[in-house]
Amino acid sequence: MKFSAVILAAGKGTRMHSNMPKVLHTLAGKPMVKHVIDTCTGLGAQNIHLVFGHGGDQMQTTLADETVNWILQADQLGTGHAVDQASPRFEDDEKILVLYGDVPLISPETIENLLDAQPTGGIALLTVMLDNPTGYGRIIRKNGPVVAIVEQKDASEEQKQIKEINTGVMVATGGDLKRWLSGLNNNNAQGEYYLTDVIAAAHDEGRAVEAVHPVNAIEVEGVNDRAQLARLERAFQSMQAQKLLEQGVMLRDPARFDLRGELQCGMDCEIDANVIIEGNVSLGDNVIIGTGCVLKDCEIDDNTIVRPYSVIEGATVGEECTVGPFTRLRPGAELRNDAHVGNFVEVKNARIGEGSKANHLTYLGDAEIGQRTNIGAGTITCNYDGANKFKTIIGNDVFVGSDSQLVAPVTIADGATIGAGTTLTKDVEEGELVITRVKERKITGWQRPVKQK
């Protein structure tokens, strides 16, 4: 379906009490306006005209990778004026969809319904019924058809009783919309050029106006303050959780789950409360994620358990692994099948081989660790000299004792043993035992220091 979109995003958002443009505030980890852009892109919009004003530099920096036409509205003179700034780019025969950068939850299904409903030469308008319509423009009908929209400040007492309200979202043909916009005036209580006045203009020409309701009323809720944004966040997360439950994912507490990206799950996955998913995350079959974990841009294979309060970012975890509790896997971390990393272990840019373990209090950075190797508690790969980073290579079946420092670059061959407390600075041959502890001494009659009076 051939259409272009105009996204209005020029408002300041005074009630947000923020230095950032309102539409850049995030919902599910993504700027509100980015949700709208992504929806239009997914539907195949030919052009996306983004009307911006306040905080223009921030807008263009944050959305630098988006394929949009940047349309400046230097003076905010109303919604009609905003759309008119983009009108020189409209093709006469294309559908023009008007959306809002602070209405982030509008769904592809609702937009498709609206595009399909546009009568030839007329307007399709998205409306919704509200028990409390205060503050919204009212839909005026005459014997059924929509004939006008009256804003709250211009409405009579009788019109204020109407519960059907305008969402501002509409579709019209480019040539018609340009003509109607050119005829707008600002003779109203706000002194603004209302986009809603094109409804009356279309009616005066005998054009049909078709009203369509959204699939879900929450889709058309806008954001004016942080309380509204928080409410939409919870609504969005509830919808995401419901989809995952329907797909077979066991969310132990759907009300305490946040998805801020994309999640792919295999069969029989279980996610406990207060888990946060960011970026692109993939879980295999029978994966268990404990409470309080944060997963970002990572892949976790079948039958792996991630125990509570672990953070995994930019990492790959194999099958049958155990992670945590309180583990941090940083970008470049790779755990092969049946690897174990436990509490207060940090791994960065390192591969831990099949069946190997680092169960306690360990930092492994810029390292390659072979199979069936045991890394004792308190082991540190000393990979950074203040200017450059160096690699530690540990072979198969190696035992590294507790409280060891491995000063890179260093290689430990297969089957070697590193005694507890060792500071290793040289390579170790296959099967060797290395120990660098200071010889133990016993001092009899030693007196512990006392505080001076």
Curated annotation (Swiss-Prot):
Annotated stretches, region: N-acetyltransferase: 248-453
Pathway: Nucleotide-sugar biosynthesis; UDP-N-acetyl-alpha-D-glucosamine biosynthesis; N-acetyl-alpha-D-glucosamine 1-phosphate from alpha-D-glucosamine 6-phosphate (route II): step 2/2; Nucleotide-sugar biosynthesis; UDP-N-acetyl-alpha-D-glucosamine biosynthesis; UDP-N-acetyl-alpha-D-glucosamine from N-acetyl-alpha-D-glucosamine 1-phosphate: step 1/1; Bacterial outer membrane biogenesis; LPS lipid A biosynthesis
Region spans: Pyrophosphorylase: 1-226
PROSITE patterns in the cross-refs: HEXAPEP_TRANSFERASES (PS00101)
Cofactor note: Binds 1 Mg(2+) ion per subunit.
E.C. no: 2.7.7.23, 2.3.1.157
Gene Ontology MF term list: glucosamine-1-phosphate N-acetyltransferase activity; magnesium ion binding; UDP-N-acetylglucosamine diphosphorylase activity
InterPro entries: Bifunctional_GlmU, GlmU-like, GlmU_C_LbH, Hexapep, Hexapep_transf_CS, MobA-like_NTP_Trfase, Nucleotide-diphossugar_trans, Trimer_LpxA-like_sf
Signal sequence range: none
Binding locations of UDP-N-acetyl-alpha-D-glucosamine: 8-11, 22, 73, 78-79, 100-102, 137, 151, 166, 224, 330, 348, 363, 374
Cofactor annotation: Mg(2+)
Gene3D superfamilies (UniProt xref): Hexapeptide repeat proteins, Spore Coat Polysaccharide Biosynthesis Protein SpsA, Chain A
One GO location term (cellular component): membrane
EC class: transferase
Assembly: Homotrimer.
Protein name as it appears in the record: Bifunctional protein GlmU
Source organism of the structure: Vibrio parahaemolyticus serotype O3:K6 (strain RIMD 2210633)
